[in-house]
């Protein structure tokens, strides 16, 4: 899998048009880009783009990521939005509304260690 980020691989206008199309077609879902932290030695994820149900919690989404990278139960995984650990009980729709980028995607970074250390309140 390429280490090129989604932003580098797709220009802004294409990303924005795609996110808009997704939101119009699937109003009950949010477009999320998931990328591994550069510093982490955790496994790579098999795909970066996800269409996440709006009512999914952050904790449930972490479970999805854990399954996609086939991470064993004893290994830790953390996800970050703008270098901040979101609350596990928060709805993905809320995190999306508060943190989506100008292109319409929510960017999530995952790591095997708590590299940033702070959490959203």
Curated annotation (Swiss-Prot):
Q: Which organism is the protein's source?
A: Arabidopsis thaliana (Mouse-ear cress)
Starting at the broadest rank, the lineage of the source organism is: Eukaryota, Viridiplantae, Streptophyta, Embryophyta, Tracheophyta
Gene encoding it?
A: ATG8G
Annotated Gene3D superfamilies? Phosphatidylinositol 3-kinase Catalytic Subunit, Chain A, domain 1 (3.10.20.90)
Q: What does this protein do?
A: Ubiquitin-like modifier involved in autophagosomes formation. May mediate the delivery of the autophagosomes to the vacuole via the microtubule cytoskeleton.
Q: Identify the keywords attached in UniProt to this record, alphabetized.
A: Autophagy, Cytoplasm, Cytoplasmic vesicle, Cytoskeleton, Lipoprotein, Membrane, Microtubule, Protein transport, Transport, Ubl conjugation pathway, Vacuole
Q: Where in the cell is it found?
A: Cytoplasmic vesicle, Autophagosome membrane; Vacuole membrane; Cytoplasm, Cytoskeleton
Q: State the annotated membrane topology for this chain.
A: Lipid-anchor
Q: Summarize the PTM comment.
A: The C-terminal 4 residues are removed by ATG4 to expose Gly-117 at the C-terminus. This Gly-117 forms then a thioester bond with the 'Cys-558' of ATG7 (E1-like activating enzyme) before being transferred to the 'Cys-258' of ATG3 (the specific E2 conjugating enzyme), in order to be finally amidated with phosphatidylethanolamine. This lipid modification anchors ATG8 to autophagosomes.
* Assembly and oligomerization: Interacts with ATG4.
Output the Gene Ontology cellular-component terms: autophagosome; autophagosome membrane; cytoplasmic vesicle; microtubule
The name this protein carries in UniProt is Autophagy-related protein 8g
Family, as annotated? Belongs to the ATG8 family.
UniProt keyword annotation of Membrane present: yes
Residue positions assigned to the propeptide = 118-121
Q: List the disulfide bonds.
A: none
- Tell me the CDD domains matching this sequence: Ubl_ATG8
- Per the UniProt record, the site (Cleavage) maps to 117-118
According to its UniProt record, in which tissues is this protein expressed?
A: Constitutively expressed.
Q: Which top-level group of life is the source organism from?
A: Eukaryota
Q: Name the lipidated positions (Phosphatidylethanolamine amidated glycine).
A: 117
